[in-house]
């Protein structure tokens, strides 16, 4: 069971929200734990509706879905339906009880193959009590991206599943989704869901894929202009709270990949080729970790567009979440060093990037000395933003 620290100015008010335990204080935050009584049922629902390689079921997809369940519960999105916030985009401006649940349209930005959209559909729909739920997932990835199943294949499978009536996908970015023409056009009857009635935006482990810090800042500006009431974030934090440096390999490897990406952008910018690089899909020469802003930089970018943190917290991923370990293993392989050298960076930049690799190897060596087979994923930070 994942432990979650939370800082909140508003108490969660729905059956999916994480429950307070009051067992101890951590740096002024209250330690809470997620209620996992129904998590296995939710995970089974997701596994029955999602397209994935069976051989990766237990090692990859069960922990991946469990992590997203922890995130969605911490976000407490359901409160937008049961107790609408004051503001725009369909909220009635009151919190009087009793309140009939309102329809909920969530925009999942950087949805990838749809894990987070599926998790929200499976977790939230049973509690809508007759109100409508729809998750629109958007991503700029090519339809043929992904292996062994492509983005197009996983999207088609999911939308044809039992969860599919609550999910749709578009290949576009937030600026296109919230284009002025869509926002300014009158909404005819039956137009729900649309760009004009988004109740919340989610970014679940997707901000690290953004190409530049400026692209993250532009996103928050776009969301502010669209008058979205709430934004929910979840991203790795570049911090580890476990003892013995168990998360160091993941942290250092992510820094190496982010520095490589920034260095390549810097070089291509000088060559007037940055736009081509930004459209390049992840691969041996474009790691999954791109701009990879830390928590402070994300909050700063959001604040510049008028967003404030309403609630936030952190949690340590479960021990069986191996994605951090796999990212770190990629960095210590010879292929990573070869990819760095193939980019044609300046000697100084190449030395700086490759100079982080020994630290990752040393982190693995310390774990081996302690009898630990795998490194742990770094802490996850989540937040709810409002304007």
From Swiss-Prot:
Positions of region (Methyltransferase domain): 98-223
GO term, biological process aspect, one = methylation
Query: What EC number(s) has UniProt assigned to this enzyme?
Result: 2.1.1.-
Keyword S-adenosyl-L-methionine present in the record's keywords: the answer is yes
Which pathway, metabolic or otherwise, does it act in?
Answer: Mycotoxin biosynthesis
Q: Does the keyword Ion transport apply?
A: no
* GO MF annotation terms: methyltransferase activity
InterPro entries under this entry?
SAM-dependent_MTases_sf
Q: Which keywords are on file for this protein?
A: Methyltransferase, S-adenosyl-L-methionine, Transferase
Family per record: Belongs to the class I-like SAM-binding methyltransferase superfamily. Erg6/SMT family.
* Its job: Methyltransferase; part of the gene cluster that mediates the biosynthesis of the phomopsins, a group of hexapeptide mycotoxins which infects lupins and causes lupinosis disease in livestock. Within the pathway, phomM' acts as an S-adenosylmethionine-dependent alpha-N-methyltransferase that catalyzes two successive N-methylation reactions, converting N-desmethyl-phomopsin A to phomopsin A and phomopsin A further to an N,N-dimethylated congener called phomopsin E.
Task: List the protein's name.
Answer: Methyltransferase phomM'
């Amino acid at each position: 069971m994942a432990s979650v620290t939370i800082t909140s100015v508003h108490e969660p008010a729905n059956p999916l929200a994480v429950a307070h335990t009051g067992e101890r204080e951590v740096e002024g935050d209250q330690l809470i734990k997620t209620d996992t009584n129904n998590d296995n049922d939710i995970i089974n629902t997701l596994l029955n509706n999602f397209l994935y390689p069976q051989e990766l079921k237990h090692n990859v997809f069960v922990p991946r879905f469990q992590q997203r369940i922890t995130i969605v519960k911490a976000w407490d999105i359901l409160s937008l339906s049961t107790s609408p916030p004051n503001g725009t985009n369909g909220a009635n401006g009151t919190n009087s009880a009793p309140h009939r649940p309102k329809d909920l349209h969530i925009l999942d930005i950087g949805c990838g193959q749809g894990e987070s959209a599926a998790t929200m559909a499976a977790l939230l729909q049973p509690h809508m009590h007759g109100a409508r739920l729809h998750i629109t997932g958007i991503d700029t990835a090519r339809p043929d991206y992904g292996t062994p199943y492509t983005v197009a294949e996983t999207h088609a499978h999911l939308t044809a599943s039992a969860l599919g009536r609550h999910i749709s996908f578009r290949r576009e970015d937030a600026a296109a989704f919230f284009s002025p023409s869509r926002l300014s056009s009158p909404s005819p009857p039956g137009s729900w869901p649309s760009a004009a009635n988004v109740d919340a935006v989610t970014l679940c482990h997707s901000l690290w894929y953004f190409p530049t810090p400026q692209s993250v800042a532009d996103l928050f500006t776009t969301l502010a202009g669209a008058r979205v009431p709430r934004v929910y974030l979840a991203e790795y934090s570049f911090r580890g709270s476990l003892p013995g440096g168990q998360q160091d390999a993941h942290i250092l490897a992510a820094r190496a990949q982010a520095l490589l990406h920034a260095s390549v952008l810097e070089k291509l910018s000088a060559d007037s080729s940055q736009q081509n690089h930004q459209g390049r899909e992840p691969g041996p020469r474009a790691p999954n970790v791109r701009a990879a802003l830390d928590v402070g930089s994300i909050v700063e970018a959001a604040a510049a567009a008028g967003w404030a943190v309403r609630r936030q917290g952190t949690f340590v991923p479960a021990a069986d979440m191996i994605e951090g370990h796999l990212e770190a293993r990629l960095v210590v392989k010879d292929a990573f060093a070869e990819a760095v050298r193939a980019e044609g960076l300046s000697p100084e930049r190449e030395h700086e990037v490759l100079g982080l690799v020994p630290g990752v190897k040393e982190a693995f060596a310390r774990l081996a000395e302690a009898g630990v087979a795998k490194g742990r994923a770094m802490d996850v930070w989540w937040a709810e933003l409002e304007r």
